[in-house]
């Protein structure tokens, strides 16, 4: 018995659809590492194709077939970059959906990284978000653009409130008759109080070729661009160091984005000028109900020109 392909029938409203697919697909992904055990990620996938006006629906079961095939093939030919995994899924989606001209794959995961606390040097686990995306387009050949990115939580300290506290402390010490030389020495040694934020830094890089963008490098760039890192486990000595380090390195939300941009240019010298760089910082304020936000969307070429490298 031949079963009907209802999806291939004509729609009553003949218009093209930009994206049709499946979302929130959970899969176990094994990412290979040279000379190390693979990283195991529990990942969420969203997979789409465009749909021409002459079709009523897309054959969505093909999306599941493709992702399972690619994950199975990874056992034989290990994948080292999650954006390459998304790129292969996007390419096969176009091959499987012969009526589509464009496919899109999103992957979101959580990665555990280990960090040593600043004084006791205890190992502490930290959760960071990692994500990848691929867009495949049909032409004379299938062209694929890949995106790799990460979101990391850290700490920022407000420079504005800190300078207000510094001026106030200087005036109080002057009123107490403390010599200016000692006041200056004290203020240069002890960071003044200010309010803090839990910052979320996000960096993504999009390329059209086989360019390597190591996740660990992205994560380090984000961590180093805030006032200091956050830790899940802190003893008293560690807590002192974290608070002191944050207040010794105060940053606005804008400073974080610019620092991330500078580090991206320094770290990724081999990326082409047409690589797309997106950087975002969201700081959850402690003394306000709102969040502070800054964003940059540019290309590596423009970024190199602005920074002068």
Swiss-Prot record:
It catalyses: GTP + H2O = 7,8-dihydroneopterin 2',3'-cyclic phosphate + formate + diphosphate + H(+). One of its GO terms (molecular function) is GTP cyclohydrolase IV activity. Its cofactor is Fe(2+). The record marks 158 as: May be catalytically important. InterPro entries: GTP_cyclohydrolase_FolE2/MptA (IPR003801), GTP_cyclohydrolase_MptA (IPR022840). Its EC number is 3.5.4.39. Pfam families: GCHY-1. Converts GTP to 7,8-dihydro-D-neopterin 2',3'-cyclic phosphate, the first intermediate in the biosynthesis of coenzyme methanopterin. Belongs to the GTP cyclohydrolase IV family. Homodimer. This is GTP cyclohydrolase MptA 2.
């Amino acid at each position: 018995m031949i079963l009907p392909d209802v999806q291939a029938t004509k729609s009553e409203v003949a218009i093209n659809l930009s994206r049709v697919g499946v979302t929130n697909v959970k899969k176990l992904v094994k990412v290979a590492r040279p000379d190390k055990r693979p990283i195991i990620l529990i990942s969420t996938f969203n997979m789409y194709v465009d749909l021409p006006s002459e079709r009523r629906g897309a054959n969505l079961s093909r999306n599941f077939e493709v992702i399972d095939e690619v994950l199975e093939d990874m056992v034989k030919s290990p994948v080292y970059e999650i954006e390459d995994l998304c790129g292969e899924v996007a390419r096969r989606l176009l091959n499987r959906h012969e009526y589509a001209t464009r496919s899109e794959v999103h992957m979101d995961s959580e990665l555990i990284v280990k960090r040593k606390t600043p004084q006791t040097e205890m190992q502490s686990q930290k959760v960071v978000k990692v994500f990848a995306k691929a867009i495949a387009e049909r032409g004379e050949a299938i062209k694929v653009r890949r995106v790799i990115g990460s979101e990391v939580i850290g700490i920022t300290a407000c420079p504005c409130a800190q300078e207000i506290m510094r001026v106030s402390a200087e005036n109080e010490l002057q009123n107490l008759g403390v010599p200016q030389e000692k006041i200056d020495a004290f203020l240069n040694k002890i960071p003044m109080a200010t309010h803090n934020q839990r910052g979320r830094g996000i960096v993504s890089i999009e390329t059209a070729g086989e360019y390597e963008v190591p996740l660990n490098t992205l994560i380090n760039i984000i961590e180093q661009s805030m006032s200091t890192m956050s830790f899940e486990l802190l003893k008293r000595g560690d807590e002192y160091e974290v608070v002191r380090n944050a207040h010794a390195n105060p940053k606005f939300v804008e400073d974080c984005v610019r620092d991330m941009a500078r580090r991206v240019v320094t770290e990724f010298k081999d990326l082409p000028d047409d690589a797309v760089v997106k950087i975002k910082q969201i700081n959850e304020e402690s003394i306000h109900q709102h969040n502070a936000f800054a964003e940059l969307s540019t290309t590596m070429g423009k970024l190199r020109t602005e920074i002068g490298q």
